[in-house]
Amino acid sequence: MLTATPLPHQLLATFLLVLASATQPAVPASTDRAALLAFRASLSPPSRAALSSWSGPLSPSWLGVSLHPATAPAPSVTTPSVAELSLRGLNLTGVIPAAPLALLRRLRTLDLSANALSGELPCSLPRSLLALDLSRNALSGAVPTCLPSSLPALRTLNLSANFLRLPLSPRLSFPARLAALDLSRNAISGAVPPRIVADPDNSALLLLDLSHNRFSGEIPAGIAAVRSLQGLFLADNQLSGDIPPGIGNLTYLQVLDLSNNRLSGSVPAGLAGCFQLLYLQLGGNQLSGALRPELDALASLKVLDLSNNKISGEIPLPLAGCRSLEVVDLSGNEISGELSSAVAKWLSLKFLSLAGNQLSGHLPDWMFSFPLLQWLDLSSNKFVGFIPDGGFNVSEVLNGGGGQGTPSESVLPPQLFVSASVDTVSWQLDLGYDVQATTGIDLSGNELCGEIPEGLVDMKGLEYLNLSCNYLAGQIPAGLGGMGRLHTLDFSHNGLSGEVPPGIAAMTVLEVLNLSYNSLSGPLPTTKFPGALAGNPGICSGKGCSENARTPEGKMEGSNHRGWLGGWHGENGWVSLGAFCISTMTSFYVSLATLLCSSNARNFVFRPVRVEY
């Protein structure tokens, strides 16, 4: 499952505030100056040193201080009052000095994020606040019920990445004016409050992020009543039960992330009502049933992640209507049948993973013909027949059209930017899907046979290629050495024969090579990977290479941990990619694969699937 980047996996929320001036009467600047000096005095000595510029008359030269412009000349007001206080990332320590802050009666924005402030959340903050950001500190305890009532004008509240642990009170309810609420990356337990917004019918809430906590119980139906929502993040909790069908009433919703919970039932057909949805992530749950054909109404959908569930059945043809899809991850399910021609209509695809399902049949001719394709993973299925030798020249990135070193920005995994504004508040989300920038193809752990197509090794932009644990036969194409960007190559556990192409020695960026357990012969073209050819009895090394020479069995070099689809176990550990990859292949299966994939059987075995656009 692919997860959202955590940031690394997962998600970053940044609030960009453009706030109108408050209309409250001016307060003498001397009061604000005294309040700021009292605030500084309440901090630890090292923290005070960070605010050494706070001396002399109150002015914009004070670090982190923005002032209201003077409205009219008056002898009693020599300088404006404080409008914004932004002390982000100054390593401030201690408890938030709320009493001095409460004296800043025209303060609109308070940003104390990315410090080391501790203690509990205060309630005695300026009632004039429109934006409060206390994220990335060491605050503990609970979100007090007095906080919303003490800040009636608040539009954005960010308390993410703290140590808040106590359950939210069922009476906790925020005012309808609130536009963005981020409580993510804490350890808050208990149930989600049934009415997190006091007046959902008149709510201005755009963003609700409760992800990466310990919330349990069902998703409250009241969330579906907040019709203004554009981003709903409940991922990485312990939520259970069905997905509320009422979520389909959120017609403004652009991002829905319920991944990594314990949700059950089926994917509700009502989600088709979220016709503006760009990002749908339901992976890592216990969802079952078939894919809903009604989802074809999501014509704007760019990211669809239903990985690691129990979804069964075939990929329905109506999903061809989702023509904007760029990232599709259906891996780790129980999807069966042949590849649907609906997939062929997703011409904007950059990432496609159907790994770890029960898909069968032949790989269609159009499988490699997506013009923007960057990553294709069909591993650990039941595909049979030959790898189609066509369509390899279509994808710009896989053919090296993105420049040297890394693919061009236009074909990297999508960075979705969702923005919205209500009156004077705007916010922006950087939803970088957690897809590695590597370009690659993984067909391991299937029942593919025949020879490796020449067109496949002509894809100069490939950085990762895994065809292991199949029944491939014939020689390794000589053009393999021309794949100058390839850093991982695995052809192990097949029936390949002949000599290893000498061009492998010129592949300077190659880090992982596994050609073990085939029927390869001849000399070693390189000594960089001494264990990569284990289980090939015909391989020999050195100038005295003879027919009976053997290379010592070893382990694959240059490996790193790769996760559930196959483990690189240590730097010199054994390699086995694909959940169903067998550790050895007996001579019986090698012979059987060679027979089935012989040139005489080719026309009988291979029946290509053709799709007309």
UniProtKB/Swiss-Prot annotation:
Tissues in which the UniProt entry reports expression: Expressed in ear primordia, vegetative apex and young leaf tissues. Barely detected in expanded leaf tissues and not expressed in roots.
Organism: Zea mays (Maize)
Function recorded in the entry: Receptor-like protein that regulates shoot meristem proliferation. Based on additive and synergistic phenotypes of double mutants, it is probable that unlike CLV1 and CLV2 in A.thaliana, FAE2 and TD1 do not function exclusively in a single pathway.
Residue ranges, Extracellular side: 29-573
Example GO molecular function: peptide receptor activity
Membrane topology (Cytoplasmic): 598-613
Start and stop residues of the LRR repeats: 79-103, 104-128, 130-150, 151-176, 178-199, 202-226, 227-250, 251-274, 276-297, 298-322, 324-346, 347-370, 372-394, 435-459, 460-483, 484-507, 508-531
Record gene name: FEA2
GO biological process: cell differentiation; flower development; maintenance of root meristem identity; phloem development; regulation of cell differentiation; regulation of meristem development; regulation of meristem growth
Localization, UniProt: Cell membrane
Transmembrane segments: 574-597
UniProt signal peptide: 1-28
Keyword Transmembrane helix: yes
Protein name: Leucine-rich repeat receptor-like protein FASCIATED EAR2
Superkingdom classification of source: Eukaryota
GO CC annotation: endoplasmic reticulum membrane; plasma membrane
Pfam families per UniProt: LRR_1, LRR_4, LRRNT_2
Entry-listed glycosylation sites: 91, 158, 249, 393, 466, 514
Keywords: Cell membrane, Developmental protein, Differentiation, Glycoprotein, Leucine-rich repeat, Membrane, Receptor, Repeat, Signal, Transmembrane, Transmembrane helix
Matching PROSITE patterns: LRR (PS51450)
Membrane topology category: Single-pass type I membrane protein
Effect of a null allele: Fasciation. Flattened and wider ears with irregular rows of seeds. Thicker rachis of tassels and increased floral organ numbers.
